[in-house]
């Protein structure tokens, strides 16, 4: 009888503890998430990068990159071919499939050097490979810009990486059109290097190639080396 009573008491205590724990789980430590719109009317927004002051640079895949300043002004800085309204543009930049103007990153020393970095599809450095060689088509680049102090324009475009592979032809993969599996995310690491992800272009052997840059994670300095 003693053993049964002891077991029953233990069971009741355990059940009560479990109910109390579940009640706490519902009310304690549960984050409340809210959302608000800060920009409207964007077309395929792809990436964002912030200055330490809170200015937000962002890309639109088939248009260009802009900045929303801490004070709320939105300035369209650099567009691709066929766009309008940007302070300046590059006619070699284009949008196709999953490719376009994609990754963007702010230099850790932005306050001093005013530099940002942008990855995009480009015709500038393509060469003949994009016409007759599926493997060797250098159609993605990483650019470096300097932003004006009033945040209204960029200058001194420098293409610091020019030989990232691009998919120029249709293939038999699902969604296998030109520009597929393109990659191009940019981020700075804690040691000051710029990290870039590149796409495999639906070619499983590309990441294993000893010299081609597709299907890899690249670590480069701010000059592209």
Predicted regions: what they are:
Residues 223-225:
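Short, intrinsically disordered, charge-balanced linker/junction segments flanking boundaries
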